[in-house]
Amino acid sequence: HSDAVFTDNYSRFRKQMAAKKYLNS
């Protein structure tokens, strides 16, 4: 199901953004 794939990719993307913010701070 495309929605499930999108949600999985989006959550992974959010984690990466959070990790970058954490490392840059």
From Swiss-Prot:
GO terms for biological process: adenylate cyclase-activating G protein-coupled receptor signaling pathway; mRNA stabilization; prolactin secretion. Keywords: Hormone, Secreted. The keyword DNA-binding does not apply. The keyword Secreted applies. GO terms for cellular component: extracellular region. Its main location: secreted. GO terms for molecular function: neuropeptide hormone activity; type 1 vasoactive intestinal polypeptide receptor binding. It is found in: Secreted. It comes from the Eukaryota. It holds the Pfam family Hormone_2. Coiled coil: none annotated. Belongs to the glucagon family. This is Vasoactive intestinal peptide. It comes from Gadus morhua.
